[in-house]
Amino acid sequence: MEEYKTILKIDKDPHEKGKYLFETDEFGFNPGQVTVLVGPNGSGKTTMLTNIKKYLRSNDIKFVSYDNVWETKLSLDRSICLEDYISAQTLMCSSEGQGVFHNISKFAERTGNALHNKAKNEKEFWIIMDASDSGLSIDKIVAIKNDLFKTIFEDVPEKDIYIVVAANSYEYTVPIKGLPIECRDVKTGKKVVFDNYEDYRHWICNYKNF
């Protein structure tokens, strides 16, 4: 059985439909690694992230959160408000992947500011990301793992940094040198290991809990 430093109590039936969305009422996490929640669309990944954020707020634990839909609107509104029309035009005319990568770059800046200011004296800090792979090519996801996740762990080794990602891209499940990645079945909380893309594809297409 896996041992985790932080164990969260999970609402198994968040929508009160009389049918459990999750098969576990506990979900464990470890700092110093990227936890990737895996499962097909509709399996509860975003709802699990909502559970996590609820726990963090109730325990006054500092965190930053990325949501693709919200970030896209926020970036455009911010650019217009600041009369940064070049950025606004870029966002409106760019592809989905280009827009997402632009948003993640801005999110990375906010994360760095939070770590060195708002959470400067905090031992524990969480980074929550939902649908950050939307429209991104493999090289951009690798860049996020290298330039954001890995850099954060190296920049503040004294902190317990938790990174939790909900994604559909296989590339997020692949560890890279110096960056441990653990995949977890969002419904059961159990660790899942994928040998290759075909293994991941088969697991998603035959998801027994869906």
Tell what function each PLM region has:
Residues 42-43, 71, 133-135, 170-172:
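Short, solvent-exposed loop/turn segments at secondary-structure junctions
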Residues 34-36, 124-126, 162-164:
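Residue-level preference for the first positions of well-ordered beta-strands
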Residues 25-32, 119-122, 155-157:
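Phosphate-binding P-loop
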